[in-house]
Regions:
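Generic structural signal of hydrophobic/aromatic residues within well-ordered alpha-helices
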Residues: 13, 274-277, 290
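Conserved beta-strand/loop scaffold segments within soluble protein domains that form the structured core
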Residues: 32-253, 257-260, 281, 287-298
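Extended amphipathic alpha-helical segments enriched in small hydrophobics
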Residues: 252-276
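Long, low-complexity, mixed-charge
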Residues: 1-49
């Protein structure tokens, strides 16, 4: 068994904060290579390990001006490492929807990468209703006029670990990134979100924003929010914000006035971020998977 470092920040911060990277136990020598699957159009992939440790690669290509949507659903109870490489051409759009529906005790390592040429766009949606641990590392580079929209929803329960790292390089002019991460933590769940917006020299006219909302439902949960904006260009605009806290008394009163006790109110709010994102996607299969997992996978 090896200890590997994953989800590294592009620029290190104070070591005492414990957020520069994450140490993860992984059997590198025993990892089974599941090969590479290439998609050049819309598709749905059901991905599972089939072995105690497995690695798979997915390449998604979109021709110039094309729009491609791919759904990746991760299942099973083992350790799964999936590398998803996005290859949009000029003015193409790739929409990637990932759903973690793995069992408790399972571990998902998801790596998404893209070099987005002129005028292209990536839409990344990640829904985490499953009970497995998730380590996600996303790295994208935007050329002139390219854009990223990223939205993530999660529910951390029991001793679950959710460790997210998203780094977007604004390399070209007039690029745009919008990042929204929302979720809830209950039991003794732990979550880290590192969001980096990196304005490179030559990215004039670019904008980037990241927003996070975290609902804390217990005294034993651990949340770490790490927004990072790097700037080597003057004419850019970068913003970040976070709303973190428990249910306030006004919200509880609202629910109680409609017949819900505290436990029921917390349950409804805990599910809200993932359910809302699934609803907004408008995909029946995704919504069914999310509801199945939120209802206990039974």
């Amino acid at each position: 068994m090896d200890t590997i470092l994953v989800n590294k920040l592009p620029t290190r911060t104070w070591n005492r904060l414990g957020v520069n990277e994450t140490a993860l136990l992984w059997d590198e020598a025993g990892t089974v290579d599941g090969g590479t699957e290439v998609l050049t159009g819309d598709g749905r992939l059901e991905l599972s390990a089939g072995a105690p440790y497995a690695r798979k690669t997915v390449e998604i290509a979109a021709a110039a001006g094309q729009r491609v949507t791919v759904y990746e659903t991760f299942r099973g109870g083992e350790h799964l490492h999936v590398r998803t490489v996005l290859r949009p051409e000029k003015d193409a759009v790739i929409r990637l929807v990932q759903v973690q529906a793995m069992d408790g005790g399972a571990v998902l390592r998801s790596e998404v990468s893209a070099r987005c040429p002129e005028g292209s766009a990536v839409e990344l949606y990640r829904l985490l209703p499953g009970r497995g641990d998730t380590y996600a590392d996303d790295r994208l580079t935007l050329a002139d006029g390219a854009s990223l929209k990223a939205a993530m929803g999660y529910l951390g329960r029991d001793a679950q670990v959710i460790d997210l790292n998203l780094a977007v390089e604004h390399a070209g002019r007039d690029t745009r990134s919008d990042i929204d991460v929302s979720g809830a933590l209950a039991g003794s769940a732990k979550k880290v979100f590192r969001g980096t917006i990196d304005f490179k020299h030559g990215s004039a006219g670019s904008t980037g924003s990241e927003q996070e909302t975290v609902l804390l439902l217990g005294d034993d949960v651990v949340n770490k929010t790490v927004p990072l904006i790097l700037c080597a260009e003057e004419n850019v605009e970068g913003t970040h914000g976070a709303t973190i806290g428990a249910l306030d008394e006004d919200t509880l009163f609202y629910f109680e006035s409609r017949g819900f006790d505290r436990a029921a109110a917390e349950s409804l709010m805990a599910r809200a971020a993932v359910e809302r994102l699934a609803h907004d996607l408008g995909d029946k299969a995704t919504a069914e998977t999310v509801l199945h997992e939120l209802n206990g996978g039974v």
